A protein has these predicted regions:
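Conserved, structured core segments of small domains
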Residues: 1-138
């Protein structure tokens, strides 16, 4: 079965990773390099195990456009969202034998090197991907 692993971040998180002054301490170049090396290794392991279907990191929320229907008319709003709002930062789609295995994969993300304040608040969601209408029912 396929599962999507989702991670989240705010505009402040993206700014801090880029080394910009923000409400959160800026990441050092070493912090960022360690995170990138971990993600490359994590992804390589999933490729080698045959479990990786796709993965992508998303750009900062400031580059977002939201389309919403208001009084029957599509209205487009440019980012940024409120700086403290967490939005989707990246995802992995994995194909593995069970929800438990997908959860094990996601749990490895908790070991990603990052400044302490990031590690304390980082979360990953794991969701099964529906292949049929019946799987959409709960």
């Amino acid at each position: 079965m396929k599962y999507m692993i989702l991670t989240y971040g705010s505009q402040q998180d993206y700014d801090a990773m880029a080394g910009k002054a923000a409400d959160k301490p800026a990441w050092s170049a070493e912090d960022f390099a360690a995170m990138v090396a971990f993600m490359q290794s994590f992804t390589k392991d999933l490729v080698e195990s045959g479990e990786l279907v796709d993965t992508r990191g998303l750009t900062a929320p400031v580059h977002t456009r939201r389309v919403q229907l208001q009084q029957g008319v599509p209205v487009v709003t440019d980012g940024p969202y409120a700086e403290t709002q967490e939005v989707l930062a990246g995802y992995w789609i994995v194909e593995c034998e069970s929800f438990d295995r997908a959860t094990e994969i996601a749990a490895r993300l908790a070991t990603c090197p990052a400044p302490d304040y990031v590690a304390a608040s980082a979360v990953a969601d794991v969701r099964p991907i529906a292949d049929s209408q019946a799987e959409l029912e709960h």
